[in-house]
Amino acid sequence: MNCVQVKDKKQIKRFKNFRRTLYKNDPFYVSTVEFTVDMLLDKTTKFAKSCITRPIMVEENQQVLAQCVLVKNPYDDFVQMAFFEGLERQEQAVALLKEQAKVFAKEMGVRRIIVGLNGHLSYGVGLSLDMEKPNTFDSTYTKTYYPQYFTDGKEHKLMAFRNTIEVFRSKLVQRPSKFTVRTVDFENFSKDMELFKQVCDETIGTTFLYAPTQDKHFEELIGEMKFFLRKENILFAFDGNEAVGFLFWHPDYNEILKKGKQNSLLSIALRYTLFKKKIKTVKVNSIGVKEKYQGRVTIQLLNEMMKYINSYDYAETNFVWENNRKSMAINRHIGGHIERNFAVYEYEI
């Protein structure tokens, strides 16, 4: 058994194939995260090019047992064991990955290792603690035995909430407001994505594990989704000329995608074109409001979203950290019950 660094094209292909084989025919897995894996490994975005990445795998008798991508984001004070995957009962193989992560951390001059973060919070976070249901678009999905490999680390829990649109709407109080809300301007998409970056960094920049974003970060990330988006999917709130909040929501595209199979951008676009009316869930991908406006503007943004989702039956949030009391309170009130549980693991070296 040995741990090897993935360097050439043949090894990278093997790395990607291990993941695909692992989830093949899994009835709860929708293969959308592969696009993020490809982005980091192939260095196709400004963000990916800014990161130091080192994919590694443990193999024995020409069989891959476990793998991950070691990542150092220049804005983080830790390294990541991102996109961890492995077979069951492979404690020794995972231990070898951890040792290499420690070596990598020392090379990068940091003393923390995070397991369960995939490059940046905007690309996905969390190992699944329970997942007997298909993953939603922009949420992670992993084998539920993975957390057992990291119980020696500090656990940070996060969860997603779900409720019916009817109940969700009933929890929102509508009040007169001096604030204005507008949709994204696709004619000035680059400019609005920089506004999105600015407001996002200013509002959720203190969230655990969040790293400041670089220029073009959201233009590259959300730009790939433009075919699937309508202008009302991204909302900005203003106090006069000052942007004070944002909300990004979208249909759960995964509901109409094939499970346990490889999905290409073309196949996703085709199925969306043919079956988009069958989607019954919307995802509240992210919402951020400057502190002094929280409450009033938060509710106004959610009420604005409600104008566009009458044809859906359910709403589900993205992740919420368990120790974020404000976010947990509003999600419990509006979001209903906890639908999914995830965890991230932290190591000090």
Where are these regions (language model features)?
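C-terminal amphipathic "assembly/sorting" segment characterized by alternating charged
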Residues: 299-349
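Conserved active-site tyrosine of GNAT-family acetyltransferases
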Residues: 15, 150, 330-331
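Conserved catalytic-core motifs of GNAT/GCN5-like acyltransferases
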Residues: 116, 134-148, 154-164, 337-348
